[in-house]
């Protein structure tokens, strides 16, 4: 997954600019982001403050780590079942 060049704090700041009355197109042009990216950020971070955004990011990272651990454990389980299933 491509890493964002904006931190959560920067994204929330950009969203707040638009909420303060600056046109969406102007905010996007000023920061060099597409309107699609802006609205994706608004759907994800709209209404969050910086600490909530950090918590969301931490939870997403933990979720991804746990999914990788589960996949590894499932592969190990399949390998062990195959090994034990063979007759000696």
From Swiss-Prot:
Any one GO MF annotation of this record: transposase activity
GO biological process, alphabetically ordered: DNA transposition
Keywords: Transposable element
Statement: the UniProt record of this protein carries the keyword Oxidoreductase: no
Family as reported in the entry's similarity comment: Belongs to the transposase 8 family.
Protein name: Insertion element ISR1 uncharacterized 10 kDa protein A3
Organism phylogeny: Bacteria, Pseudomonadati, Pseudomonadota, Alphaproteobacteria, Hyphomicrobiales
